Amino acid sequence: MSTVSTSAADQVRAAFDFTVDKFPLSGPDGMRTPWYAMFRSDNNEVVGEGSVTSRYVPHQTEDVIALVDACESVFDEASQVKTHFRNGHYVTVSPSDEYRRSIYGSNDNIFPRLIIRGGYDRSAFNVTLGIYRDACMNLAMLRSVTETYQSIRHTSGLRFAMDELVAQFETLKNGWNTLESLVHNMQAADVSMVDFLNEVYPEPDADAGQRAVTIHRNRTEKIFRRLQRERIKTGRPAIDSSFTVSAWEAYNAVQGFHQWDAPRREGFKGEFDRILQAAKAQPVRKAEDLALAAAA
């Protein structure tokens, strides 16, 4: 991951200073096939998870920059840009602090984050409006909120579709108001943390082995410790014997565990990998459903 203090376009261009090129695949003795693979120009690493046909046109860094430019045309100049490459381009764009929203007191605030994904898996670009919570440094994406996700129709030549891109980012900007309202509703809704966790992570079966029981207990303890730390940091009162907390806190405790504390295999322990893995984790999605249901 890289972060540099130049213009957003220059940051992206410097981070992705290579092309992704398509080359034909051959069979034994040079036999021709209809299949192609993609390779990075700087290190010759294979990109993507399968072969493509001759019709496939891989996107390039300038396409990613076009999306960043469209983002800035709607959200104004980015205060920070971070980049990551794993079988595709990932960029997070941080709009200015004027979009900050206070959720509880002065120490629990949320900020919008635009997550741009341009993979080489034959799917379109997509952009997700995420929530960055400063109290725990979680970057969460509420998948069930439709205004926070846009699929980009084009896979290359995005510079020629700027009007369309800007319109899609306008939709995401409107989605920030929706997210703010939902988060305030989650903060106002009380849940039992014990019941919440039992819904997300059911108790192991009676015949489960000791290892399953230990994993379940250790996970629960880590989530409760995270919850307690965040309550102290945000100035909330101590939890009483009913273990009642806001749905917002309960969701963040689960999401934060999967982003920061859950075991990750070697090579997938970086900040961006953890964000992406947490977003795909089934317990995080279950926690989102429960928190939004409580806030409805």
Region roles according to the model:
Residues 1-66:
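Feature for intrinsically disordered/low-complexity regulatory segments and propeptides
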Residues 1-26, 83-86, 98-296:
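Intrinsically disordered, low-complexity regions enriched in serine/threonine
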Residues 38, 93-94, 116:
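Generic structural hydrophobic/aromatic packing signal, biased to beta-strands
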Residues 63-75:
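Hydrophobic, Leu/Ile/Phe/Ala-enriched alpha-helical segments that form helix-helix packing faces
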Residues 72-98:
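A short acidic/basic microdomain associated with nuclease active sites
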